[in-house]
Structures are given as C-alpha cells and as structure tokens.
From Swiss-Prot:
Record field: compositional bias (Acidic residues): 241-264
Expression triggers: The expression of this protein is developmentally regulated and is correlated with the 20-OH-ecdysone induced activity of puff 74EF.
Protein name: Ecdysone-induced protein 74EF isoform B
Keywords on record: Developmental protein, DNA-binding, Nucleus, Transcription, Transcription regulation
Bias-annotated ranges (Basic residues): 672-688
GO terms for cellular component: nucleus
Gene name of the encoded protein: Eip74EF
Predominant location category: nucleus
Length: 883
C-alpha cells in the first residue's frame, strides 16, 4: 500500500501540475466565486481523494481532509449542480472515506458542485480537479499523496478505472442534473476506492467504516443524492471489503455501459478524450461503491439528460478534451471499454466473451452490473438501496431488468468483483458478499430470468436462479440443497478449500488461470449466465467462494453437466452461502448426491484439480467454439427461460425446461465468467479457483452438449446430468473429475436426449400408429407392398374363386361391378392388409376416397354397386353370369 501510495503520489504530482493548470484555467474562466469554490472544491476533492487513499491504504490521511474546505464548500454546494457533479462525487468519495472529513467534504462537495461549472473543463478527470487543487492549495502532503494514490489505483486498475472514467466523463460531458451526477460520482468513487489493488482487508474494513460514515453523512448532507448514495453505501458496508472492489469495478463497468447506452459516440469520445476522470480519485476511497451507485444514476440521468442542456454537454466536451490532454493513454483503454460496453449493451453475451478473455471483460460485466445498479438505484435510490446491501444488489438486478444480458453480465460482474475482492478482501467483505450473494443471486436469477424473458436477461441463463434452483425440486432443492451442500459438504468444502488454498493454490491457480483464460474467452460468451454469478459471488466471499467453488467442483461439475445451475447453485449453496438455497435448487435435484459427490470431490478434487483443470480447460476450449456458437441460441432461450425461471422457479417442469436451456447459457455463461473471475479469485483461492475451473470445464462440456441438444433435451440432460454428475462426481471425486465432468456433461446430454426422445418417441409412435392403420385402410394399402383397394377388387373380379361368389361384374364394358358379399370382400381386404378388424364400413370409406381420385364412381340407386371410371383393357374377363 505504501509503495502504491508513493507511486500514486509520483504520478499524482505530475498529474496535479497538469490538472492544476487546467483547473486554474477552468476556474479562472468561471466567475471568481466559482473559482474560489473550485479551489475549495479541489481542496475537498484532494482531501477526499486523500481521505479515500488514507481510508483504503492508511487512515493517517483522513485527518488531512477535515480542513477549512467544508465551510467554503457548503455555501456553493448547489450553485452549479451539473458542473459540480463530478466534484461532488469527489467530495462524496472523500465523505465516504473519511469519517472526520465526511461532513467537511460534504460541504466541499457542495462547493465543488458550484465550482464545477468552471471546473467542468477539468471534469475530464476528477483527478485533475483533485490534483490541481492539491497542487494549488495542497491542503496537505497527505492529500496530494492520497490523490496520487487514487491515481495509482486507477492506473493499477486501468480497465475498471477506464470504465469509471468513461462514466465520469459521460457525467462531465453530459453534466446532467447535479443530483444525478452527484450520485453517480459518489457511486463511482465509492466503487473505485475499493477497487484499488493495494487495498487490504484492514483497508476494506476502514473503507467499510468510511462507507458507514459516508452513508450517514450522505444521508445528512446529500440533498438529492443522499438516498442513492446511502443505498450504495449500505450496499457496500456489508460487502465493503469484497464488494467495495467489486462495486468499484462494477460501477466502472456499469458506468461505461450507461455511458455507452446514453451516448455511444460521446462515450467513445469521452473514453478517448478523457482518460483522467474523477474515476481516478474515486478509486482512492471506499466511497466508490456509493459513487458508483450515484454514478449509475447520474449516467442514467445523463442518458435522459443529454437533452437536458447543451451547455452541459459542451462542458462535458471540454472536460473530455482536458482529459484527452491529461491522459491520452486512456483513450485506447476507454475506447476498448466503450466498445465493450457497447457490445454488452447490444450483445449482452458478447461482452461477456470479451470479459472472459480479459480482466477488462470482467470490468465490462461489472460495468453492466453497475449500470443496472445505477438504473435500479435511480428508481430505488430513495429507499431501496439504503435497505441493505443485498437488497441493493437485488433491486439493482430487478431494476436492471432492462436487458437480461446486461443484468446477467452485471451480476457476473458483481460476482467477479466480489470474487476479486473476496480473494483479496477481508473475511468481513466475504461474509457481506456471501449474504449479498444469496440475496443478489436469487434476485439476480429472478431479474435475470425476467430480463431474459424480456430481453436476455439478460439472455444469461440462470441455472442457479430461483427458477433454476426450483427447476427440479424447487422447494426442497432451494431450502434443502443449499443446506445439504452446506451440511454434507459444508465442513468438507472448508477443508477442501483450505487444502486447495494451501496445497493446490500455486498449481491450481496457474492451471485455473490458464483454464479460465482459455475457457473464459470461449466460455465467457456462453457462460454469461447465472453460473458466473454464483461462482463469482462465492468467489467474492472467500469463505463462500471456497465452499461454493468446492461445490461447483463437486456438485456443480456434475450439476454443470446435468444442469448449468449445478455449479452455480451449489456454489451459492456453499456453507458460506446458505442463503443461496434457491440457486442451489437447480443442482438440488442432484443436491444430495451432488453435495455428497461435491464433498467427495472436494476432498479428492483438490488433489486432482490440476489435472482436472487442465483437462477441463482442454474440454472447455474444445467446447468453447460449440458453446460460442450455441451462445446466441442459448442466450435467446436463456433469456426467455430466465424469465420463466423466475416465474416458474417453483414449478418443477418449467424449471427443468428452463434449466435445460439455462444450462446451455449457464454452463456456457458461468464457466467463462467463473474462469475470468476465478482467475483473480483462483490466485487468492487456488483451491476455489480450481473448483470453479473444474465446474466450468464440466459446465462447458455439459453446456456444449446441452447446447447441442434441444431445450427439452437440455432439460432431460440437466436432470440426468445432475444425477449422473452426482454419481460420477462421487465416483470420480479423485483426479479423474475432469474426465467425469465431461462424462457427466455428455452423460447428461445423452440421458436427457434419450429421456426426451424416449418419452416423446413413444408418445409420438403411439399416435402415428393409429393413424397409420386408419390411413393404410383408407388409402387401400397404398403404402403396403401389395395393391390398392381398387386393384384388389379388380383382382377379385378376375379370380374365379371370388368373382361370382363375393363380387361380380354387372356391366363389364362400363366397369360396373357389385359387391355380392360385402362382408366377405371386406374380410378378404382385411386379410390382404393384415387388418383382421376390417369391415365394409371402413372399406367403404376407402372406396369413397376413390370417388375423389376419379378411379371409382358410385352407381346411384344401387347398393354395393360401383363403377370403374377407366376400366383396364387387359383384365381377365370372367363370365359371372355363367357361374
């Protein structure tokens, strides 16, 4: 942390000189009062950044911020809502991060908001304001150092920062309503500070404390954004350790997504032009979570508010230019992030692929998640998010119903963020994440399902979603499987996790990283669904991650193969995540067996993780192409099914079907994400990552298999796969898990296919048989190797054994004949057709069919008398009269 701070300080001082110049220019261009406000704002931003840095790396810096800026900032707080929005965010970040300076920074935020109008040009990077303020006023070396630290953090986490910057840029460029910007920036910064790589658990704890204080202060000081900020704060406080980082990344990604949604072109420009955005500062503090929430709201408002004022957009453009000058390097990053966000918006699953390929994709997922959160926060800002962190996630997902794909991605991002934070974050953060994960996961699945039903969910497929959980034994699985998993494998997962962590981490993390990298690229597209979320969430919470990962390795592997939700569900159901019973439901119908298998696998899996990871990696790689191809179908069906899942999560049949489809997406979706996210997590928790990788590999195999199969087949495959996976997992708990998992996936596919075909074929066969019999009779054995009914009658007329006795000519020239013994003729016809139940009525229907064909005609006024329309000339004539 200290080294990072020094590095940040070095970069921050350089930045500060540039930012100071731009800030001075901006403030000078603005009124003197605004310039003074900007100076106090910059001071507050610097103090806030320092407080963020201090909050995160060292609490020492926090005292610096509670300096004079608060009184100055208080008056101008609302002077220029659009312009001051970003500064406000910085101030809010400071508030969030600094307990003593929270109030002062709130005041400073207000002042900065006023000053922000002139500062808007600086807005290209909140860092510029903060740094320039630091350079000018340099309230204290700590503040300047803190700001650089935040900058360093930003540089360290350039992908998330890029998105955050994108978000802040869009905020600045849009200069939407002050409220929106204020909330958005606060969220951004709140998320950013946790995302700083150097944060430790102690830092996370500090951040959580700061978040709590910021929450309170925001409640008091934030006029419009107080509720939204509180919600993100509350959201972060429980998850502060893990979720702060996740939230920051998520916010960054979400901001980028929101910006892309709001203005694709503007975002591109913003990404290119403004690589220095408040993002850098926001990274410094724990307030980033709240800032990201606010930023999401502000980003949304920007979308709406771009039309609000042209001047705001102009200011934002200036800010973007300033940012361009400040950080041209981030142009590429921002363009990439922007493109990613665009891809996410348009192809929720596609972005996931990107995400799986690189940390930037994870950030994209996070961005989507944050965008969803922001959107959700805007509707729920007042009270929903304040309720609880888990609620915040849930509502975010619910609000995020905008697009199932985005929601899934966001969820995945959240999971990835949580997993990243959980790996490096404190156990508190993990616990918070675990709590949130269960809530968020069920909610996400629901939202995910709803969205997918509506859009994709997001087309992300939720095997572990509530629907997924309830897919087979919804209620028992939801309540019992997680319990079963936690109870049956609850103790073992920890031991396995410990084993994986202690013994397997290096190799596992390496193989997991390799497998995740390989599978993430291809599987990311496919596995953008719920699976990532459960895995990510469990990754988020170290405890839950380990348990979940182990479960995902054990149950999920089987369950992935059987039902994409198996890994996702079992992971959420890990001891750390008992709240995720709903998600476990998918794997629940496997749950007891899966839990047992998972437990056995956890014990042996850790040993076999490397081999499993490698094998699974190969399998995943081979399946990635298939999964990617199937992604589109899976995403579509997954989206629809996710919505169904949420609605039918408690209906086993529907749930099964949904799971079948979800497994496609979830198997595909979760694995890539689990791999991308598990890469970060795998290093901290090699064992867990191995589990996730194994589960991902199994899921990938199952997903590819399931994808091949129809949705019904997928459902059958999931059911059979869960059973087979449980059995195979238990049997192959050892190093052969990778093989078993593929087997499970293939088995699940085969079983599902057989079940589906068997059941349907039998039914279909029965139905067709009757028609065939009837049709055969009606069509006079056309399909038979013998003759048609008219040909049969003609033969009878030429056979002395039957001619005068059962049938005879009444007018040979005209082809008129009579059925002397209609019953005998019908019996003969039945014998000929091998239909002993043939009768004249049935045969008569066949004869009437020839009326239409122009072969026979009915002679009016005479029973059983028919006429050949065209009498063949080569028939053997029999003198029926003589006989």
């Amino acid at each position: 942390m200290i080294m990072v701070q020094h590095l940040v300080a070095a970069s921050a001082h350089n930045f500060a000189s540039q930012a100071a110049a731009s800030l001075v220019n901006v403030s000078s261009s603005s009124s003197s009062s605004s310039s003074s406000s900007s100076s106090s704002l910059s001071l507050s931003s610097s103090s806030s950044s320092s407080s963020l840095s201090s909050a995160t790396p060292t609490p020492v810096a926090s005292p610096v911020t509670p300096t004079s800026p608060p009184p100055a900032a208080a008056a101008p707080a609302e002077a220029s809502p659009p312009a001051g929005a970003e500064l406000q965010e910085d101030g809010q970040q400071a508030k969030t991060q600094e307990d003593p300076t929270m109030k002062d920074q709130d005041m400073l935020e207000k002042t900065r908001q006023e000053v922000k109008d002139p500062v808007n040009v600086e807005e290209p990077g909140a860092i510029v304001d903060t740094e320039s303020v630091m350079a000018r006023q340099s309230p204290s070396p700590v503040a300047s150092t803190k700001v650089p630290e935040s900058l360093e953090e930003i540089s360290n986490k350039s992908p998330p920062v890029q998105e955050d910057e994108e978000e802040s840029e869009s905020v600045a460029s849009d200069c939407r309503e002050f409220k929106v910007l204020y909330n958005h920036l606060r969220q951004q910064q709140h998320h950013h500070s946790p995302s700083s790589p150097d944060k430790t658990r102690s830092t996370l704890d500090d951040v959580s404390k700061i978040l709590w204080e910021r929450k309170q202060q925001l409640q008091r000081s934030s006029v419009i954004t107080a509720a939204p900020t509180l919600q993100p704060q509350q959201h972060q406080q429980p998850m502060s350790d893990i979720e702060d980082e996740e939230t920051l990344e998520d916010v960054d990604d979400a901001d980028a997504d929101v910006e892309a949604d709001a203005e694709d072109e503007e975002l591109l420009e913003q990404y290119q032009n403004g690589y220095d955005s408040p993002l850098d500062l926001s990274l410094g503090g724990a307030t980033s979570a709240a800032a990201s929430a606010a930023a999401a709201a502000s980003a949304v408002s920007r979308r709406r508010g771009r039309t609000y004022s042209g001047t705001e957009s102009d200011d934002s453009a200036q800010c973007e230019r300033a940012r361009m000058r400040l950080k041209p390097e981030r142009k590429a990053e921002r363009s990439a992030a922007y493109k990613k966000s665009l891809m996410k918006r348009y192809y929720t699953e596609i972005p996931i692929v990107k995400q799986s390929t690189s940390p930037a994709p994870q950030q994209q997922l996070q961005q989507q998640h944050h965008l969803q959160q922001q959107q959700q926060q805007q509707p729920h800002n007042g009270s929903t998010f304040a309720g609880a962190t888990a609620l915040l996630h849930i509502k975010t997902e619910q609000n995020t119903l905008l697009t199932p794909l985005q929601l899934q991605q966001q969820q995945q991002q959240q999971q990835g963020l949580h997993g990243a934070a959980g790996n490096g974050g404190s156990s508190n953060g993990n616990n918070a994440h675990q709590q949130q994960q269960p809530l968020a996961i069920p909610q996400r699945p629901l939202l995910h399902n709803l969205l997918s039903g509506g859009a994709i969910h997001n087309p992300h497929h939720r095997n572990y979603t509530t629907a997924t959980t309830g897919s087979f034994p919804p209620s028992p699985a939801d309540s019992g499987v997680s319990d079963v998993d936690s109870s049956s494998s609850g103790g073992q997962p920890c031991a396995d996790e410990l084993k994986a962590r202690l013994g397997m981490p290096p190799a596992t993390s390496a193989s997991a990283a390799a497998a995740a990298a390989a599978a993430a690229a291809a599987a990311a597209h496919l596995h953008t669904g719920t699976f990532l979320h459960p895995n990510l969430y469990q990754n988020n919470a170290a405890n839950s991650l380990r348990n979940i990962w182990n479960r995902s390795v054990g149950v999920p592997d089987n369950y992935y193969g059987s039902s994409g939700a198996g890994s996702g569900g079992t992971q959420p159901g890990g001891p750390g995540n008992p709240q995720t019973p709903g998600y476990l439901t998918t794997s629940y119908f496997n749950a007891p067996t899966a839990a047992t298998a998972a437990a056995s696998q956890r014990g042996t899996t850790i040993n076999g993780y490397h081999s499993l990871h490698q094998q699974q990696q190969q399998q995943q790689q081979s399946q990635q192409s298939q999964q990617q191809q199937q992604l589109a179908h899976q995403q579509l069906s997954h989206q629809q099914q996710q919505a169904l899942h949420q609605q039918l999560s408690h209906q086993q049949q529907q749930q099964q079907q949904q799971q079948q489809q979800h497994p496609h997406s979830q198997l595909n979706g979760p694995h890539p994400h689990s791999h991308p996210h598990s890469h970060p997590h795998s290093h901290p928790h090699a064992g867990q990552h191995t589990h996730s990788t194994i589960a991902a590999a199994a899921a990938a195999a199952a997903a590819s298999v399931v994808s091949s199969s129809s949705s019904a087949v997928a459902a059958a495959a999931m059911l059979s796969a869960s059973a087979a996976a449980a059995a195979t997992a238990a049997a192959a708990a050892g190093g052969s898990q990778s093989v078993i998992q593929p087997a499970t996936s293939s088995v699940s596919y085969d079983l599902s296919y057989m079940l589906e075909l068997g059941g349907f074929q039998q039914r279909k066969a029965k139905k067709p048989r009757k028609p065939k019999l009837e049709m055969g009779v009606k069509r006079r054995s056309r399909e038979g190797s013998t003759t048609y009914l008219w040909e049969f009658l003609l033969k009878l007329l030429q056979d002395r054994e039957y001619c005068p006795r059962f049938i005879k000519w009444t007018n040979r020239e005209k082809g008129v004949f009579k059925l002397v013994d209609s019953k005998a003729v019908s019996r003969l016809w039945g014998m000929h057709k091998n239909k002993p139940d043939m009768n004249y009525e049935t045969m008569g229907r066949a004869l009437r069919y020839y009326y239409q064909r122009g072969i026979l005609a009915k002679v009016d006024g005479q029973r059983l008398v028919y006429q050949f329309v065209d009498v063949p000339k080569d028939i053997i004539e029999i003198d029926c009269n003589g006989v």
